[in-house]
UniProtKB/Swiss-Prot annotation:
Basic and acidic residues: compositionally biased ranges: 28-39
InterPro entries according to UniProt: LURA1/LRA25, LURAP1
PANTHER family in the record: LEUCINE RICH ADAPTOR PROTEIN 1-LIKE (PTHR33767:SF1)
Modified residues (N-acetylmethionine): 1
Organism: Mus musculus
Biased composition (Low complexity): 48-75
Span list, region Disordered: 24-81
Originating gene: Lurap1l
One of the Pfam families matching this protein, by short name: LURAP
Alphabetic keyword roster: Acetylation
Protein name per the record: Leucine rich adaptor protein 1-like
Domain of life according to the entry: Eukaryota
Keyword Acetylation: yes
Annotated GO biological process: positive regulation of canonical NF-kappaB signal transduction
Length: 221
């Protein structure tokens, strides 16, 4: 029996949209596959196919496995790109944090300067208030002293010239004499008058006694 002619695979390729693998074509030709080629075959089909229908049943599995291989490689490529984007975002965030820290440091320095200026102004205001209070207290004490002196002088002057302060009918001289009586060893004008009268009497008596002595002396002589 003669071998059947090789079937036309173009119709199958047009229907599948893919080229028939070489291993399948060899099996259709009736050639024996080597052990290495059978092991390397992704379809895992060994031996020869007797008809085109049996070979066509394995074609979709081969095409599906070949079509799934590019899709499995796409996540591997997208994974590094996602890592790169994440690293880029982290770098940007770190740079922004550094900028924010520098801005925070500048703001803190400005706040410290403002606080120091406020404290200095407050100290100056307090010092000025204390100086003003001291000056006002000194001026008030001086004014009170002057007023007290003026009132005391006026009161003493008025008491001397006023007769309604308990000295009715008594002169100032007699009042001073009464005050001098209270002082021990102090001679009043009345004492001086008595002293002058007694001295005059004693002098007159002495004058009257001396002529008598002289006359008696001359008599005995």
């Amino acid at each position: 029996m003669e071998d059947s002619p090789l079937p036309d695979l173009r119709d199958i390729e047009l229907k599948l949209g893919r080229k028939v693998p070489e291993s399948l074509a060899r099996s259709l030709r009736g050639e024996e596959l080597a052990p290495r080629e059978g092991a390397a075959d992704p379809s895992g089909v060994g031996g020869s196919c007797s008809s085109s229908s049996s070979c066509s049943s394995f074609a979709p599995s081969v095409s599906s496995s070949s079509s799934s291989s590019p899709a499995s490689g796409s996540p591997r490529r997208s994974h590094p790109s996602a890592l790169e984007r994440l690293e880029t975002k982290l770098h940007i965030l770190r740079q922004e944090m550094v900028n924010l820290r520098a801005t925070d440091v500048r703001l803190m320095r400005q706040l410290l300067l403002i606080n120091e200026s406020i404290e200095s102004i407050k100290w100056m205001i307090e010092e000025k208030a204390t100086i003003t209070s001291r000056g006002s207290s000194l001026s008030g004490s001086l004014c009170s002293l002057l007023e007290s002196q003026s009132t005391s002088l006026r009161g003493s002057y008025n008491s001397l010239h006023d007769g309604s302060d308990g000295l009715d009918g008594i002169s100032v001289g007699s009042y001073l004499d009464t005050l001098a009586d209270d002082v021990p060893g102090h001679q009043t004008p009345s004492d001086l008058d008595q002293f002058s009268d007694s001295s005059i009497i004693e002098d007159s008596q002495a004058l009257h006694k001396h002529p008598k002595l002289d006359s008696e002396y001359y008599c005995f002589g």
